UniProtKB/Swiss-Prot annotation:
The active site is at 194 (proton acceptor). Catalyzes the reduction of the glycolytic intermediate dihydroxyacetone phosphate (DHAP) to sn-glycerol 3-phosphate (G3P), the key precursor for phospholipid synthesis. Belongs to the NAD-dependent glycerol-3-phosphate dehydrogenase family. This is Glycerol-3-phosphate dehydrogenase [NAD(P)+]. The gene is gpsA.
Length: 341
């Protein structure tokens, strides 16, 4: 069990990394935030603001920031990685020789390893070795609301219960509820797939297809999550909780979601390039859609919504063509007989 005297290192000074570092610092933990952008790091360390990702939101005076990875992790009780998925492997590999003995590694990154489609816990385990406690932090949470102190609930799934509990206890507070679990596969799957499905609901809303269509896409999107989860050995209850349904609903309905905003722009006729440029931050769904479908093909699972999103993002179909393809599918039972058995 950690105490408020234990240092925590947070790697990644984007909006979510800054929000979680701010949360930990407000809870009394000595927290150091590492980032690559010297201007952003200086602003956080000296002016207690992240002007690029969370402008106008004050950060705790106690939060320190640095561009020196070795300095950031030195003496840390545990380390939290919060980078985009495409930078996760590189960050963990840089961390490996610097990690203090006994320090567990958690991450709040959502997605798969680009190219291989591997889960991030597989990447971390390969790089860090078998003896390092690992955990994934996930759930319905917008960075801006967390830094504003608005109520939020997340879940921490780990392969060592004591480490997952340590991470959850450090984050848990008056406006931030942290639960625990042991299904890292399900937790990571939900956090990745919801980004793809948020594009679908954004496209539908951008095309002004109505609330019925949005509700249908969310529900059938959850069905896709559950079917892929069953195929890869995840627990269905994980996908029905904060890591799956909770994150799915938030990302599909909240306009703070970058992936939903991407879908809205595409549904209104913008190009992918213009939409991504306008959003101005990493949009995980562009790469994640490929990796979700790679997993689906590997396990022989049909994911029609996710596949149409992938096709639209690659310019293989227009949003209108993707919609027609979904509506033209044959009638069938809502759930396979074997899904919950």
């Amino acid at each position: 069990m950690s105490t408020t005297a234990d240092k925590i290192a947070v790697l990644g000074a984007g909006s979510w990394g800054t929000a979680l570092a701010s949360l930990l610092a407000r809870h009394g933990h000595p927290t150091v935030l590492w980032g690559r952008d010297a201007a952003v790091v200086e602003a956080i360390d000296q002016r207690h603001e992240n002007p690029r990702y969370l402008p106008g939101i004050p950060l705790p005076d106690s939060l320190r920031a640095t561009t020196d990875l070795a300095s950031a992790v030195e003496g840390a009780a545990w380390i939290l990685v919060v980078t985009p998925s495409h930078a996760f492997g590189e960050t963990v590999r840089a961390l490996a020789p610097l990690r203090p003995a006994g320090a567990g590694v958690a991450w709040a990154t959502k997605g798969f390893e680009p190219g291989s489609g591997r889960f991030l816990h597989e990447v971390a385990r390969e790089v860090l070795g078998e003896d390092v406690p690992l955990a994934v932090v996930t759930g319905p949470s917008f960075a801006k609301e967390v830094t504003q102190g608005l109520p939020t609930a997340i879940t921490v799934h780990g392969d060592v219960p004591e480490f997952a509990q340590m991470v959850a206890e450090a984050m848990h507070g008056p406006a931030f509820r942290a639960y625990t679990g042991d299904d890292m596969v399900g937790a990571e799957l939900g956090g990745a797939m919801k980004n793809v499905l948020a594009v679908a609901t954004g496209v539908a809303d951008g095309m002004q297809l109505g609330l019925n269509a949005r509700a249908g896409l969310i529900t059938r999107g959850l069905n896709e999550m559950l079917r892929l989860a069953a195929a890869i050995g995840a627990k269905p209850e994980t996908l029905m909780g904060l890591a799956g349904l909770g994150d799915l609903v938030l990302t599909c309905t909240g306009d703070l979601s970058r992936n939903r905003r991407l879908g809205l722009a595409l549904g209104r006729g913008q190009t992918l390039q213009d939409a991504v440029r306008e959003i101005g931050q990493v949009v995980e769904s562009v790469q994640t859609a490929d990796e979700v479908m790679r997993q689906a093909r590997r396990h022989g699972i049909d994911l029609p919504i996710s596949d149409r999103v992938r096709a639209v993002l690659h310019g293989e179909q227009t949003p209108e063509e993707g919609l027609r393809a979904l509506l033209a599918r044959e009638q069938k039972p809502e759930y396979p007989d074997t899904l919950f058995k």
